[in-house]
Amino acid sequence: MKSTITFFIALIVAICFFNCDGRHRAQKSYTENLIKENLPSSFSEQVTFYPENYAEHVNDTTLTNGYRAHIKSYSDMVNHVVITEKKNKTILKTHYRKAIGEITVYKDNSEVFMTVINDQLFSKHIDNLPKDFNQYILKSLWVNQYKSLKNNQLIVDVLLQKPKSKHQINCQLIIDSKGKFNIIKNV
């Protein structure tokens, strides 16, 4: 009698083990299993930063009309524009880091102008910016040598672009020999 009870207990334990082998999950996709188990959404979210790490670019330009420009642009590691897309049930979040520019202008070896080129500078000096201007990032800035020599001023071209689109804002930062400046938005 004792061996019969032991046999039935062993049989019940064996049936339980064979029924808990995960076959019901093997027939479902990975995504269905994640949803059923209510696992964190971090498995279905991909976050990337562009650029991934700090980036810096320094450019010194000397012109024959006595102007010299020191331009430094670098990644803003705090402020960024987020573009969210959904692809194959995965949420893709791309963080485009904003860039900051610093420009120092010399005329005949004397410093005449220095400023930080960021969103606040354009917001202060340009009236007709798009409503979503905070979604634009500084793409590049460079000395326009031809116009600078022609007008005897330092003219810096600035390109701002909205990530993942063709929307751009082209501006010119015009600096005279006394350090007075003006920003013109090109149409």
Task: Label every model-predicted segment.
Residues 38-145:
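Surface-exposed acidic loop/strand-edge motifs in secreted or periplasmic proteins
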Residues 2-6, 98, 103-105, 172-176, ...:
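N-terminal, helix-rich and Lys/Arg-enriched segments in bacterial and organellar proteins
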Residues 12, 61-63, 95-97, 148, ...:
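A generic structural signal for short, solvent-exposed coil/turn residues
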Residues 1-34:
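Bacterial Sec-dependent N-terminal signal peptides
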Residues 113-187:
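Extracytoplasmic electrostatic interaction patches
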Residues 21-31, 39-43, 47-66, 169-187:
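Acidic, small-residue rich beta-repeat scaffolds with periodic aromatic anchors
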Residues 4, 23, 74-76, 108, ...:
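Generic structural motif
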